[in-house]
Swiss-Prot record:
Protein name: Vitamin B12-dependent ribonucleotide reductase
Record SUPFAM superfamilies: PFL-like glycyl radical enzymes, YebC-like
Active site positions: N482 (proton acceptor), C484 (cysteine radical intermediate), E486 (proton acceptor)
Enzyme category, top tier: oxidoreductase
Segments of skewed composition (Basic and acidic residues): 1100-1118
Gene: nrdJ
Length: 1201
């Protein structure tokens, strides 16, 4: 093919000018610890820091890149395009550790990708001459550097490693079809033929151990996950539970095998180190195990709730029983008939159904001298052991719904389920299969809807619609999809994806869409994806053969939501639907026209001749949708697609869409097509951030105000850049736009603020120097109070200038502005002016009729009420679907208050509007997700242990109760020896020195504590001294240390934050929290309350279970001699505890930043995030991305995009 330049001009053999700069990349946890760091990396100057971080952290090759390279001569390949290998002679001059390293420049990555594609394209005659190859290379580098487009993640991971650096490895069992001979070949190298495909669909036979069977599928899946890809399978071939086996007996059923695959997937991280494995499990709606499949995740979520609750109850009650065994002397203490305290704790345990054998076990352990039970408390964090224990957490689940089933639901008809063997036998014998069970279709529909409402799964795939648009039905039906549901084709095929950044094609002066530029990009990236099929290797023989035979591609786009906002068009409008259809048609039909051009030179795909009439029928239907043809004109469709409505589409876009449709059909009729499919709409998770997209895939924006990451660290609040352009398009003046933008993001200054402004603060005693400090912090502040804290203003100013004592401004909940006499209403007004409302609703000058242009997926800010309905999402999907070969990956967000009827309506509307697949996510439908309404309902409602004891011991004889309490806590005070052992621990908590001293009994148990903070104020020091005496008296009267630990850990007040001087504890929420963490670690072995485990401090042993706790110069009993482990030694809690995990502990909690749990989650939600924490960097900047989550800080996803 002859290539022409469009974006570049020749310049000394390089692509057109791109400004480059050196940046540092650092991703940290909330506590400041490093996740990743790279310095002086070369990147395009206009890339955001987030894009730089993701490229450096995820897509740079970290090792194996030689410092010196040399070219490998190859006949017919120009020197600039030849492969490179390590130059061993030059490398020998370097120290061994300096010979290889990692990539340090974005240009290296772009060269690796573009060079590899160009090499394979030139080698197999995709270009008419060397000049065309050079143009192709330059244009691709330019598009990557300017963020116009990006390939899927496996391309970034794998493509070009062998071509650019000579990196190789042992073959992993892959296959490829030799393009020269067309013969299947087993790979001998891991990287010579890369694995660039992200999406796979695999089949599974009803066979346990043979090739193509169940256990073989897990091996094939593992091979895919290792190289960063995702896979989907329809498991309907597997027999249902109790279905007869050929050799006698009954089948264990589909679900038993799905649980094996789920476990295998959970053990593998995709791409080696970056993401969890991603997989899709599909099941036909007539499978005999369909009900169990629908309920799978609902049931497993219930198990998580049970595990979490049960672990906490067991821990509390079993340790209470253990403690009761030490409240008196002699053998009678183990007899509940003679030890009233033991009897009471056993009764309490039995009330909450603690197993009898565990109660007996604890008493037996107490007889043997054990004094504590280590029973791990599980949490609802999605990465916790509770979720790791249950099944179904490593796949997206979808049900294949036929038109027959949907009609049965509509008409309230019965629905038959069939044993697999019976269905197959009936097909062979040419008769109607006998059902194994008959249900009401609506009952099954109710189950599907409830499960999606309760657990966000299953999604739906509309089997009949999918197959009516199938280009190759002669080779079998489409049975499944990839994990994100955008790739839908034959079993044992693969698709590699790429997405265009639509925002780059909007002229920000004229606000017109650059049709020619977009067409050019679509053409080049169709060629790239086709070349990628030629160079690829695959995880099995079948996939290699069928992917070569059908050559499916997955070109798509991102940033549609931003484009619509820039053009001043509401996402939920007829105009948006028409423009979406036009853009999709231009992309889709340009890709097919390019495919036909390649077919002219390379020949059509192998399976084309057999399927020619079907494929041309599908292309004609695509063209009819571009012309908005009436329903009677379509061929072979039961549901009429949504065509491009000419009344709402700009004429130039409509003309282009129809021209491209005409061209694709005419070229296809003449030459055939090189590819069976060409387009999908992927979620563009990580690659969307690399392209600095505001919105991913076909999604709308999630918020109007963003927090831009700064190169030097920190964040800067900005308005979504689509907003000013959208306002301009709507006719607002520059001054009106400025006012609206400032209303949203804030003025970032006190000048002009209502009530709390520069003048008012000067009258309160603020100096010009201090006001400058406040002003400098306002652009970074999310709330005005953050600018008025002691760290920003300085303690000296607060005490000397404002006359506020340290005791006052150090007190919990202290607000300087309120202390100065400003009301909460004053503060809110000033906060809205300075920091913004984060919503456009009620903005000055903005007409209410223009509100819909700026509607987002979620409510914006704390005042926002508007958000896009589920119907609007479905309508946009319906507008794009007629111009997409595959499907659209999208999860529709529903608010927490959505009801099951909404789920039913959304899934039903999706079918009626000819969407191929859909998934819904109701806010809070996962137990692991923090939810505002739950937090607000339960905030402040904590369990008072003493009140609980009082209520539990209530009876008709109050005098008797009083006697028991006196007997228990007063009559048996245990005196400490006059000379006692103990230890002194010095630490600094939040910048304040703390000395903790302990006193011990002869047996090593703690009996007293002393707390010294001698530089603090007299009142605070005296309170701490009184507190220490109170605790000491309690310890001497038999109050177990663990009770204090449970009561006071996670207690929050200042000083708090970073802890230095303690080898196990690095972060605390208060001095009291620190003290009881330290005591728990030393005397109870509770290393889960520290951030550094003992094994992290030992260099020569791994996880010794008999680790010795050390005292001040005195060795204590080994842990195992006084602590019983009911379960294996508890897994240490990670330093960054998720919000759901913190809630589950039923203690006042805070984030490492010191902000309360409720406030932190509220802030995340107000900013438009979900409230979940990122598993990679710990930030709370997670947004929903297709059916997964994506971190806006580091780019990690919980799926395959």
């Amino acid at each position: 093919m002859k290539m022409n330049r469009h974006f570049t001009v020749p310049q000394n053999g390089e692509s057109s000018t791109i400004q480059w700069t050196k940046r540092n990349s650092k991703i940290t946890n909330p506590d400041g610890s490093k996740v990743f760091e790279a310095n002086d990396i070369l990147v395009p100057e206009d890339w955001s820091q987030v894009a730089v971080d993701i490229l450096a952290q995820k897509y740079f090759r970290r090792k194996g890149v030689p410092k010196y390279l040399k070219k490998v001569q190859e006949d017919g390949i120009p020197e600039w395009l030849q492969k490179s290998i390590p130059d061993t002679e030059k490398l020998e001059s370097l120290k061994p550790e300096d010979r290889f390293g990692g990539e340090t420049s974005a240009l290296e990555v772009f060269h690796r990708l573009a060079g590899c594609w160009t090499y394979w394209g030139y080698k197999y005659k995709y270009f008419s001459d060397e000049e065309s190859a050079k143009i192709f290379y330059d244009e691709i580098v330019y598009m990557l550097a300017t963020q116009m487009a990006a390939p899927n993640s496996p391309q970034w991971f794998n493509t070009g490693l062998n071509w650019a650096y000579g990196i190789d490895g042992k073959s992993q069992g892959h296959y490829y079809v030799d393009p020269s001979t067309g013969k299947l070949v087993k790979s001998t190298s891991a990287y010579e033929h890369p694995q660039p495909h992200a999406c796979f669909i695999q089949s599974v036979d009803d066979d346990l151990v043979n090739e193509g069977g169940i256990m073989d599928l897990w091996v094939r899946e593992a091979r895919l996950f290792k190289y960063g890809s995702g896979t989907g399978t329809n498991f309907s071939n597997l027999r249902g539970e109790n279905e007869p086996l050929s050799g006698g007996g009954k089948s264990s059923g589909l679900m038993s095998f799905l649980k094996i695959g789920d476990r295998a997937a959970g053990a593998i991280k995709s791409g080696g180190t970056t993401r969890r494995a991603a997989k899709m499990v599909c099941l036909d709606v007539d499978h005999p195990d369909i009900e169990n499949f629908i309920d799978w995740k609902v049931t497993e979520e219930k198990k998580v709730a049970s595990l979490v609750t049960g672990s906490m109850l067991n821990n509390r009650h079993l340790n209470a029983i253990m403690s009761a065994c030490y409240e008196m002397e002699g053998e009678d203490r183990f007899n509940p008939k003679k030890n009233s305290s033991l009897k009471k704790t056993i009764q309490d345990a039995k009330k909450v159904l603690i197993p009898d054998n565990y109660i007996k076990r604890v008493i037996d352990l107490a007889r043997q001298g054990y004094k504590e039970i280590l029973f791990e408390e599980l949490t609802t964090d999605w990465q916790s052991d509770a979720y790791n224990t249950v099944s179904g957490q490593n796949s997206n689940n979808s049900i294949r719904l036929t038109n027959e089933f949907m009609a049965a639901v509509e008409q309230d008809q019965p629905w038959n389920l069939y044993f697999r063997t019976e269905k197959e036998k009936a097909k062979v014998e040419g008769r109607k299969a006998k059902p194994s069970q008959t249900l009401r279709a609506r009952e099954l529909w109710e189950k599907i809807s409830y499960a999606a409402w309760a657990s966000a799964d299953p999604g739906t795939q509309y089997h009949t619609t999918i197959n009516e648009w199938h280009t190759c039905p002669e080779d079998g039906p489409i049975n499944a999809s990839n994990p994100c549901s955008e790739y839908m084709f034959l079993d044992n095929t693969a698709c590699n994806l790429a997405s265009a950044n639509l925002q780059k094609f909007v002229n920000l002066e004229t606000l017109n869409f650059d049709v020619e530029g977009f067409r050019y990009l679509c053409k080049l990236w169709t060629i790239i994806l086709e070349i990628s099929v030629t160079m690829a290797q695959f995880p099995s023989k079948e996939i290699a053969e069928l992917s070569y035979k059908f050559r499916t591609l997955g070109l798509g786009y991102a940033n549609l939501g931003s484009v619509l906002m820039v053009l001043g068009i509401p996402y939920d409008s007829q105009q948006a639907m028409a423009i979406t259809g036009a853009i999709s048609s231009i992309m889709h039909m340009t890709a097919y026209a390019t495919s036909a051009e390649m077919a002219k030179e390379q020949g059509p795909f192998v399976g084309y001749a057999k399927n020619q009439k079907h494929m041309l029928r599908v292309i004609r239907n695509h063209r009819r949708a571009a012309y908005n043809a009436p329903s009677g004109d379509y061929e072979g469709l039961t549901i009429t697609p949504i065509g491009i409505n000419p009344a709402f589409c700009p004429s130039y876009m409509l003309k282009a869409a129809q021209e491209d449709a005409d061209l694709a059909l005419s070229l296809g009729e003449k030459y055939g097509f090189r590819n069976a499919q060409v387009t999908v709409i992927a979620p563009t998770g990580t690659i969307g951030l690399v392209m600095d997209c505001d919105t991913t895939g076909i999604e709308p924006d999630f918020t109007l105000v963003k927090f831009k990451k700064l190169a030097g660290g920190g964040y800067f609040k900005i308005i979504n850049q689509s907003v000013p352009y959208g306002l301009k398009k709507l006719g607002y003046s520059p001054s009106e736009i400025e006012a609206i933008v400032n209303y949203c993001k804030g003025h970032a200054t006190l000048n002009g603020a209502p009530v709390i402004n520069t003048q008012a603060l000067k009258e309160k005693g603020f100096t010009n120097e201090i006001l400058e400090k406040v002003e400098a912090s306002l652009p970074l502040a999310f709330d005005i109070n953050f600018a008025f804290n002691k760290f920003n203003l300085g303690e000296n100013f607060l005490t000397k200038n404002l006359g506020i004592s340290k005791e006052i401004f150090d007190s919990p909940g202290f607000s300087l502005l309120e202390h100065l006499g400003f009301t909460k209403e004053d503060i809110n007004k000033a906060n809205d002016y300075v920091c913004g409302t984060m919503t456009i609703e009620n903005a000055p000058f903005l007409k209410e009729k223009d509100y819909p242009v700026f509607d987002c997926a979620n409510k914006c800010g704390k005042y926002g009420k508007r958000f896009l309905s589920y119907e609007s999402h479905i309508r946009i999907m319906a507008a794009a679907q007629p111009f997409i070969s595959g499907a659209i990956s999208k999860t529709i967000n529903l608010p927490e208050e959505a009801v099951i009827e909404d789920i039913k309506n959304a899934y039903f509307l999706s079918w009626k509007m000819m969407i191929k697949a859909n998934a819904l996510y109701r806010d809070g439908s996962k137990l692991s997700q923090p939810l505002n309404s739950v937090l607000e309902l339960l905030n402040g409602i904590e369990i008072d242990d003493q009140e609980e004891i009082r209520e539990a011991t209530i009876s008709k004889d109050p005098v008797q109760i009083a006697e028991k309490i006196v007997t228990k806590y007063i009559s048996h005070r245990r005196k400490l020896p006059s000379r006692r052992a103990g230890y002194t621990q010095k630490a600094i908590v939040g910048g304040h020195k703390v000395y903790l001293r302990t006193g011990e009994y002869e047996d090593g148990q703690i009996g007293e504590i002393f707390i010294d903070m001698h530089k603090e104020g007299a009142a605070f020091r005296s309170l701490m001294n009184a507190f220490a005496i109170s605790v000491s008296l309690g310890l001497q009267h038999g109050v177990p240390l663990e009770e204090y630990v449970d009561a006071f850990t996670f207690f929050k007040f200042e000083p708090n934050g970073i802890v230095s001087g303690n080898k196990h504890i690095k972060m605390s929420t208060s001095v009291i929290d620190y003290i009881f963490r330290e005591l728990a670690i030393t005397y109870l072995g509770r290393y889960d309350l520290g951030q550094v485990a003992p094994e992290d401090l030992r260099g020569d042993e791994i996880g010794s279970k008999r680790a010795t706790a050390e005292s001040n110069g005195q060795e204590k009993e080994t842990l195992s001699s006084m602590t019983a482990v009911i379960e294996p030694t508890p897994k240490k809690e990670v330093e960054t505890i998720s919000y759901s995990q913190m809630i589950s502990k039923e203690k006042p909690s805070s984030s490492p930043s010191g902000i309360s749990l409720l406030e932190e989650v509220k802030l995340a939600k107000i900013k438009g995030y979900t409230g979940d924490s990122c598993s990679e960097c710990g930030s709370f900047e997670m947004v929903r991305n297709g059916s997964c989550l994506k971190c806006m800080s580091c780019g990690s996803t919980t799926g395959c995009s």
